């Protein structure tokens, strides 16, 4: 595990009101890699009593954000897709694992898998990142 990747994740998390509001926790970090978790609450359920797709997207997007900023170079999403494969329910602990597939000078491609506590895939997300200049902690 990269100490630098953890530093960058903690620096971002300090200002990440959305991740905090959703109860997202950072579990593991490395360069181009992040694992985050979230427990589905009653407030996250849709009219079918399953986890709202927007909440799943936010979990995957958070893992993506930490992975694509793990090297300390500021990056944002330029495009994202998600496939919902099975529902999450209240009380489920969902884990999103993000891995870099390609990182160029400016753009990157990251795949994120969300699994439930039975290790069954809930959603697959692909994010494309774009480096915007600047650094996360003031040093790259």
UniProtKB/Swiss-Prot annotation:
Which SUPFAM superfamilies would you find in this protein's record? Thioesterase/thiol ester dehydrase-isomerase
What domain of life? Bacteria
Which pathway does it operate in?
Aromatic compound metabolism; phenylacetate degradation
The protein's Enzyme Commission number: 3.1.2.-
Per its record, what triggers expression of this gene product? Activated by cAMP receptor protein (CRP), integration host factor (IHF) and by phenylacetyl-coenzyme A (PA-CoA) that prevents PaaX from binding its target sequences. Inhibited by PaaX.
Please list the GO terms describing molecular function.
Answer: acyl-CoA hydrolase activity
Of which family is this protein a member? Belongs to the thioesterase PaaI family.
Q: What is this protein called?
A: Acyl-coenzyme A thioesterase PaaI
**Which source organism does the UniProt entry give?**
Escherichia coli (strain K12)
